[in-house]
Amino acid sequence: MSRTAFFISDGTGITAETLGRSLLAQFEGVDLTLVVKPYIDTLEKAHDLAAIIAQTADRDGERPIVIDTIVDQSIRDIIAAAPGFKVDIFSTFLAPLEEELATHSTYTVGRTHAIGRDDVYMHRIDAVHFALDNDDGARTHQYDQADVILVGVSRCGKTPTSLYLALQFGIRAANYPLTEDDLDEDGVLNMPKALAPYRHKLFALTIDPRRLAAIRSERRPNSRYCSMDQCMQELQQAEALFRRYHIPYIDTTRFSIEEISTRMIAETHLTRRFSPR
């Protein structure tokens, strides 16, 4: 089964897309084409979009799914008249909340992104700068300022996880790659000197060797770096290090960056400086 889903908003569309994706992810047997339409904030834009929804229904032979967070009632009415299956997130939840809280909603466009905006912005920028400055073991002298230090072999997901933690939660995440330089004379991977004072901040990532080899092949094909033997050896040594020093770790093979991050936060009890956008 193939369907089209529209995520529509009079703001950035982040809320509609995030909630919509979460809902639609529950239907694994449906092949979905996802369309994001932000800033539908005028009647003209609403009419144009309604026409697109109608064209999509004709083309697919099925009415598209329409998930929106539009505040303006006149714009909502235009979208509602289009031939789509409408999931109005705000109207679904605001009415019962108004009743429970005994007060009326302000129905303000972009309100979710305005709450504490200046403070959130500064935390986000600070955390992103920190993640970039401390990527791949670049500045180990700043580890005392880190909320968490991600460790693992090259290409196991440390950098994207660090940036996601910074962008979504304002967490100052550094990351350190475990390499052959950290082997002792007997070929055993030891705790790197730069990390030893911060063992309480360490969280490790590992990955299936076949997946790691595939990822590395995209970067350096036909090299020792991406060979299965090399990947298996590095991962075995890294996981032995994690166990020896009781460093918590997660296998990233089957998890998205979002899942890796939230699982890590739950396990380490890191403090979020703000909630996701």
UniProtKB/Swiss-Prot annotation:
It is an enzyme of class 2 (transferase). It comes from the Bacteria. Its EC number is 2.7.11.33, 2.7.4.28. Keywords: Kinase, Nucleotide-binding, Serine/threonine-protein kinase, Transferase. It comes from Chromohalobacter salexigens (strain ATCC BAA-138 / DSM 3043 / CIP 106854 / NCIMB 13768 / 1H11). This is Putative phosphoenolpyruvate synthase regulatory protein. GO terms for molecular function: ADP binding; ATP binding; phosphotransferase activity, phosphate group as acceptor; protein serine/threonine kinase activity. Bifunctional serine/threonine kinase and phosphorylase involved in the regulation of the phosphoenolpyruvate synthase (PEPS) by catalyzing its phosphorylation/dephosphorylation. NCBIfam families: PRK05339.1 (NF003742). It catalyses: [pyruvate, water dikinase] + ADP = [pyruvate, water dikinase]-phosphate + AMP + H(+); [pyruvate, water dikinase]-phosphate + phosphate + H(+) = [pyruvate, water dikinase] + diphosphate. ADP binds at G152, V153, S154, R155, C156, G157, K158, T159. The lineage of its organism: Bacteria, Pseudomonadati, Pseudomonadota, Gammaproteobacteria, Oceanospirillales. Belongs to the pyruvate, phosphate/water dikinase regulatory protein family. PSRP subfamily.
